[in-house]
Amino acid sequence: MSTAKKFEVLFVLGGPGAGKGTLCRYITEKYGYVHLSAGDLLREEQTNLDSQYGELINRHIKEGTIVRVEITCSLLDRAMQMSDNPHKRFLIDGFPRNQDNIDGWNKVMSEKCIVKGVLFCDCSKEVCTERCLNRGAAGSGRTDDNEEVLAKRHETYITSTLPIIEHFEKQGAVYKVNSMQAPDKVFEEAKEILTEIGW
């Protein structure tokens, strides 16, 4: 891929219910970049009857645990390759979620992508939980929007994903937004960050 333009990637991280998907939707509507949700790709693959990974993904989602990085990276890679977006700029939400994810990404994707940094949706556990439960009650159709799985997901976020955010922070590559605000306010903060990274 040395002659072709590399994909540019901004990871979007935060706890479950921090507003990652909502913020990505605002950004894609304004700028035309591509939003790839690792969770959505896994949920789609889970329902694909031809997928060799469906059963395995289903088990991880129900238990609130992290799917093997090879699976997630292959789904992200496929989605980026299939995209006809002229910008070649991707918001990847909900990934990387642990050190294994970073190692796997570096092994498989580092030749194809330039990582611009992490857009960190900073939100309290209480607000995150309330949003997810409201989303579940409103019929999100997500099997992981219930209190029991949410507790596990939040625990996984604290133990596995927060250290990843700290890892990028040491490189000066974390851009924080206060995602406890209304979505349009969060978006205003994000626009300044996008200008800063040259997007």
What are these regions (language model features)?
Residues M1-W199:
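Glycine-rich phosphate-binding loop of ATP-dependent small-molecule kinases
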